[in-house]
UniProtKB/Swiss-Prot annotation:
Binds directly to 16S ribosomal RNA. One of its GO terms (molecular function) is rRNA binding. One of its GO terms (cellular component) is ribosome. Belongs to the bacterial ribosomal protein bS20 family. Keywords: Ribonucleoprotein, Ribosomal protein, RNA-binding, rRNA-binding. This is Small ribosomal subunit protein bS20. The keyword Ribosomal protein applies.
Amino acid sequence: MANIKSAIKRAKTSEK
């Protein structure tokens, strides 16, 4: 389930 974690991290970083 690291896929969803990676997606969340990417979305959080993209929000910058």
